[in-house]
Amino acid sequence: MLRIATCQMTSGPDTAANLQTAEMLIRRAAREGANLVVLPELFSLVTGSSEEVLKNAETYQDGPIQSVMSALARSLGIWIAAGTLPLKSPEPNHVTNSLLVYDAFGQEAARYDKVHLFSYEGTNERYDESELYTPGHKPVSFTIPLDNGTDVRVGLAVCYDLRFPQLFRLQSG
């Protein structure tokens, strides 16, 4: 049986504190029997400063956040869908908003870069994720083998992606 835990946390600009909270929640979920733990979007860093995001972006497959998530998955023997974190993008002054999945051996099982970036323009305010984030370009799913010999396929999406059913149609095909 697949037991999924979703972790709700209030992240801020202190990556170390965010990682400490995430680790505590992951360990609690594992103790309670979860074999897949899902962290929220931007679990590692929430700040209003694009400069801080760019400064703290990790190189893909090389960074402290990725190392911690991999080590936790391995030591606890569980799968972790690491929320999203900013990864360096080839596009100048941009990052990807990336969800990384680690298997129970700590190996990366999937990478999904958020495809649908949110934007809003109101009377007195404006927000556009594309000013900082490079969008992903493809649907991603992964398979978790269960103890009974069956597999469960899991499709990945982040926040605003939920408004686009075509993403899920592509994942199911």
Report the location of each language-model feature.
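Short, acidic/polar
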Residues: 17-28, 164-169
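Short polar catalytic/cofactor-binding loops
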Residues: 8-13
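Hydrophobic positions in the central parallel beta-sheet of the AAA+
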Residues: 7, 37, 155-157
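A conditional alpha-helix N-cap/helix-loop micro-motif detector
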Residues: 18-19, 62, 160
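Active-site catalytic loop in hydrolytic enzyme cores
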Residues: 58, 90-173
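Extreme N-terminal starter segment of soluble prokaryotic enzymes
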Residues: 1-5
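Cys-nucleophile CN-hydrolase/nitrilase-fold catalytic domain and related Cys-dependent amidase chemistry
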Residues: 15, 24-105, 111-113, 119-120
